[in-house]
Amino acid sequence: MFQINDNFQKLPGSYLFSTIAKKVAAYQEANPDKEIIRLGIGDVTQPLAPAIIDALHKAVDEMGNAATFHGYAPDLGYEFLRKAISDNDYKARGCDISADEIFVSDGAKSDSANIQELFSANSRIAVTDPVYPVYVDSNVMAGRTGTYDAQKETWSNVIYMPSTADNGFVPELPKEVPDMIYLCLPNNPTGTTLKKEQLQVWVDYANKNGSVIIFDAAYEAYISEADVPHSIYECNGAKTCAIELRSFSKNAGFTGVRLGFTVVPKELKCGDVSLHAMWARRHGTKFNGAPYIVQRAGEAVYSEAGKAQLKDQVAYYMNNAKTIKTGLAEAGFTVYGGVNAPYIWLKTPDQMTSWEFFDYLLENANVVGTPGSGFGQIGRAHV
């Protein structure tokens, strides 16, 4: 008889955002007259920028003509998009990342879950607490996290790096050396980030100890302070210890379009084995390439018109974050974030748990937040 992957049975409950969606749907069904403000997932509300729409229309027209039709895309991405990414996101910031070190995908979420496939099953991971749940869940599925303590909401084989108000949401270097270190900066969910000299410390630590940093830079477009790096490759030595994940969802509103990319430098090796070559092999086996239409839309992100339009969109979302943070602070809540990321991290009042405050917000203000416990133990008293 066939057997299942028992590691899936270790996953506690349902995925955080699926649970939120079910609770909101039930509330909406019971209260059809209520207008709900949905802040429970990092989705966008503004339409795609005109430059992107124009690129989509043009690409669709090409697909309707036999002479310009495109079938399967190159599995690693079209050269026109990879070059645009290299020139604008990296070389423009002094980062020596070439187009062929960029792997185009259907989004950062899938890449952040899949990247762990490059590493052995006995590799140990280190994550911040709170943490984006995909990093942990994907390693649970791979059998890498040990046993789960439901009371503490922790895994026995995961190294946790607390990020709290007491340390300014800047985790300390782990005393126990991990094989893989997950960093999301600017951070989801706390909205905080590191300055370049702080990030350099992590790069030096990884190189010294033979660790790999999985660096999620999905929110880099929201950085407003000059001394905060947009890429880990702005740090010396990062190409020998870091993989970077990027998304078009946050900077360009592609949540319903789906596009992202991962950077795996050729210098990143385990002994004589190239992780760049491994990821290329994995990508070619498991992915048929992002659609031509979508990649042309991605290229438009880097056009002059696209840059200007998206700058305005980012400003719109950051103004929303500022408004929310200011209002909550004036109402007496303790809040963080909202400077280099569109996230506000709120301390729940009156010793309420995050799910209790989630229900309170939904039932009394018709507002959907995200319970902090979904991001880890430290998030129990936050949304």
Residue map of PLM features:
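Conserved glycine-rich beta-strand-loop-beta hairpin in the small C-terminal domain of fold type I
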Residues: E299, V314-K325, A329, V335-K347
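Hydrophobic residues in well-ordered beta-strands that form the structural core
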Residues: V127, F215, G369-P371
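Conserved PLP-binding active-site segment of the aspartate aminotransferase-like
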Residues: P342-M352, N366-H382
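Conserved core of the PLP fold type I
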Residues: A67-A206, E220-C235, I243
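N-terminal small-domain helix-loop-helix segment of the aminotransferase-like
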Residues: F2-D106, V301-A305
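Conserved core segment of the aminotransferase class I/II
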Residues: V140, Q151, E234-A315, K322, ...
